[in-house]
Amino acid sequence: MILGLDTELSEKDVNPIGDKQIFFDGNCLNIVSKQSVLLTLPNLWLRDNCLCDECRNVETEEKSFILSTVSCDLTPSMVDLTEDMLSIGWPDGHQSDYVLADILELSKERHAPTMSWGKGFQPEYVNWSSFLADDATALIALTAFLQTGVMIIDGAPSQSNSLELLASRLGPIREVLFDRIHNVCLETRVYNVAHTALALPPHNDFASYSFPPSAQALHMLENGAEKGSSIILDAWAVAEKIRRQRPDFFTTLCDFAVPFRQFDEDNETYAVEPIIKCDSGGNIISVRFSNQLMQAIDPMRTGVNDFYQAYHCLCCHMTDSDNHVKFRLEGGHILLVAAHRVLHAREAFVPSGKRHLQDAYFELDNIANKVITLNKYKAALYDG
């Protein structure tokens, strides 16, 4: 059935088509099914998302139409809804076609939602050789990693710079200052407390960057030291707990920008950012926490006292052992963390034997890309 729009329509104008109806409400087209709104489609959204060859680059599948070429009060001149296909005619004679199922798919998440750890949580282990050689193993491991933010690879080589070999699964190393692959041992130059035998409180690295690395791999080459257990912490869970218990503290930690600095003789990085960041929907996307890199705040700034009340609460949660997951990294273990979510720490150790760790940085977007491409490859195998 085709509905012509020769006159201005109000929301009282209804077009019954099968079990669906079309309502026009201002600048939107509403599709109603079984007394509930199935889709609300702004006119400009419809025009902007036309998939025809004229509006899309056929070779690259990129959009070529730009919205400034039509009026902001654009309205359809014709609507046709046949089963699952919506066709729109525009005043300039252009026609756009849409599959309703494809539009509904846009509301689905591209990846499985993140999972809270729960009591007794321990990271999943995956074998180095299987992870690199077997796509199915890598897909399972990386999918779980995107959900929990942590995994451990065991059986890794003891050779220096073996982290370079993870690029085939994690994407390229994210280069930062202070070395491409960092050596963390007592024999190296000391510009960070990690290069001592002291305890290292929960933190994520490079809080001093405007956008810190979003994934970190910590490769234990050798661990002959006594004590020195590794610790991880789900900082998003801590932040959510504060949001529930003290929403005023949570708001302060989202709004008050804090200075962070990391430096040595040759380099310096400095950023002033809030500790907690949320997306437009209020979901936590980053917790930036580094006691050792945080710098003095101007005490005359508005809100400093409120910030310190909130920060004290946060520090108490971060150092509470009930929030910690503890384990020992042995030689050949690689701890991989989603660094904007999972903080890492270390207990003090006794250097009775050599303890040598190397770490490098990656980007979560690239890891997510690997999951997408591996899923496509898996689907192609089944289709074939």
Question: Can you describe what each PLM-predicted range is?
Answer:
Residues 1-134:
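Motif-centric detector for short Cys/His coordination patterns
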